[in-house]
Amino acid sequence: SLGLQPKTTQDFILKELEDWASFGVEGHFHARKPWLSYHEMFAEPVSKIVGAKPSEVVVMNQLTSNIHFMLVSFYRPAKERYKIICETKAFPSDQYALESHVKFHGLNPNDTIVEVEPRAGEHTIRHEDILFAIEKNKNALALVFMGGVNYYTGQVFDMKSITHAA
């Protein structure tokens, strides 16, 4: 899923490795691009992608770790509200994280995770099918977990409408 390596990547990584060798832990403060504040350079461009203010965005860790942090905070299954709706063929580690948290709460992923999939003969998920799944499961729904763009198909989801429906 990484695609082709950009031509400048190797030089960039080698410079970071040189700084690590030269500065050790002090690279957090004295590297050519100090590591301590590294995340700050991403706030502005990422905020535009997610429709937030730069002060509301932080880029940290790696995606799967962040998904686990998010699930610990927001997935609170109850007796009647325990289901998770997600798109089929989400990034595999996203699926593993969902299954992990469902099992942690003593639930069966087959009964808990509702995957919305394309109709027979189609390659993308119809928006109305996502909204239907939300409506159909509304009394048992604890979380809607949709990526903004499906990594496998490139399909862009209407997150505003999905969020409003949920």
Regions found by a protein language model. Name each.
Residues 1-166:
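Pyridoxal 5′-phosphate
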